[in-house]
Amino acid sequence: MAQNTLRLVEENGVDKSKALDAALSQIERAFGKGSIMRLGANDKVVEIETISTGSLGLDIALGVGGLPRGRIIEIYGPESSGKTTLALHTVAEAQKKGGICGFIDAEHALDPVYARKLGVDLENLLISQPDTGEQALEICDTLVRSGAVDVIVVDSVAALTPRAEIEGEMGESLPGMQARLMSQALRKLTASISRSNTMVIFINQIRMKIGVMFGSPETTTGGNALKFYASVRLDIRRIGSVKDREETVGNQTRVKVVKNKMAPPFKQVEFDIMYGEGVSKTGELVDLGVKAGVVEKAGAWFSYNSQRLGQGRENAKLFLRDNPEVAREIELALRQNAGLIAERFLEADKDGSLDDAAES
């Protein structure tokens, strides 16, 4: 009896294998070769290609060394928090590797002089200033399907105004129209983005929900679709000022990885954004160096390999700016200790910045 049962199981196994092979060949005949495959059959499928954010600390916090290609990214935060700066840094890093980038300026507010200071190659940057939200997303879809563009930035979701709203009267109520526009566009874009390996960065603004008694009243514009389709969501906030004597020369910025499909989320990192310069790389080297034990701190003095960098953080930053070889050595040491640094990053506060961050 046991032998008969064993033979039946073996025959079922053979039948299943044959049935699966027949199904796979039928799918490939109908939809083309490569429409279905075993994940382990191609090593390239598993690898995650990334582009640096321009911030060493944020690259480490993301867990994969930067923002992933072929994915949708959302960067949101209050006004003047550094959203566009972070997106432009990513564009500059992609261009350094020979990539082609596009900037869809729905807000009509891109400053070319500032972009150049951040390292963006303006001569090779594709820019569009569309009239309507439909036009902006159609341009984005066409660029993605071309397969020739590496990074596309949409600035911002809040400025993607539906055509019906522009053609209607001022004050006319059109509830949910922008959310429907985003939902339809993202359904179309997702498959094309994955196939073309293009990174699409959506910059978003924050709004307040009325009548919220418990939890954060903050939410992002454009409905819920972007929260679900985004592989990485970054919450960027200004937490203080960087001062040179009495003059404010930059912002202290905190970025929380609210959602991450590539690595564990909820890591957060702090860095300086200097006016006219962007992310302060030397400031990050000092802060991360101390956190990783690469840079020693005794009182107000910072030192590296028994060499004094300066008294006080600002003097240490100036020393690294004037001595790029030492800065390069520290950066190399930090990249080798990336895992250790990631563990030491503080997790985001339990209350979170958006009450719906956990849902997405």
Swiss-Prot record:
Positions with a binding annotation for ATP: 77-84
Alphabetic keyword roster: ATP-binding, Cytoplasm, DNA damage, DNA recombination, DNA repair, DNA-binding, Nucleotide-binding, SOS response
GO biological process, alphabetically ordered: DNA recombination; DNA repair; SOS response
MF terms in GO: ATP binding; ATP hydrolysis activity; ATP-dependent DNA damage sensor activity; damaged DNA binding; single-stranded DNA binding
GO CC annotation terms, alphabetical: cytosol
UniProt KW DNA damage keyword: yes
Highest taxon of the lineage: Bacteria
Presence of keyword Zinc-finger: no
PROSITE patterns xref list: RECA_1, RECA_2, RECA_3
Subcellular location(s) of the protein: Cytoplasm
SMART domains: AAA
Function: Can catalyze the hydrolysis of ATP in the presence of single-stranded DNA, the ATP-dependent uptake of single-stranded DNA by duplex DNA, and the ATP-dependent hybridization of homologous single-stranded DNAs. It interacts with LexA causing its activation and leading to its autocatalytic cleavage.
Family per record: Belongs to the RecA family.
UniProt xrefs under PANTHER family: MITOCHONDRIAL DNA REPAIR PROTEIN RECA HOMOLOG-RELATED, RECA
Protein name per Swiss-Prot or TrEMBL: Protein RecA
